[in-house]
Amino acid sequence: MVEVRRLLEYNEKIRHRYFEAMAKLSWEEFIMNREASFHSLRNIFIHTLGAADYWLDFLQKADCHSKKKFDEYKNFDEVKAYMETVDVRTRNYLDSLPAGGLGKKYTLKNDADETIEITAEDILIHVFEEEVHHRGEIIALLWQMGVEPPLMGWKDL
């Protein structure tokens, strides 16, 4: 069975590949409204970072996530800096977990306003799948632009 830590390491590696591919586009192409979930490639990419950042705050009982709006990211360097911040936060959180820490339980309200009990691992799997879903969207947008997306297979399959 694959441990959630490996999934998050995979996501980080692939996230960097996709960022590097998108950074080859012009800034105008990156921020163009493409009528997708969060409109532009920039916004979709930042949304996935923001989701991870938000849930890390939840898990750490912190308020460290970026408060910047999509349009406040004005160049690739700013997006890359945010990506690297989320990478470090994720690694630091995982490294700080005690034995059994992934099993820590939380009670919260979901988007359907239902009270649910979940574990830290459940939250991290949600973070993983949120990024994977939006990566599919980014892939489709790149294809529409005539850009071949980077390889993303698990274990480089």
Stretch-by-stretch model annotation:
Residues 96-111:
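Acidic catalytic patch
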Residues 1-5:
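Basic/polar N-terminal segments that are highly enriched at the extreme N-terminus
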Residues 62-100:
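Helix-adjacent hinge/juxtasegments
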Residues 6-17, 81-85, 89:
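A non-catalytic, amphipathic alpha-helix used as a structural packing/dimerization or gating element
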Residues 8-20, 24-69, 111-157:
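Short, contiguous alpha-helical
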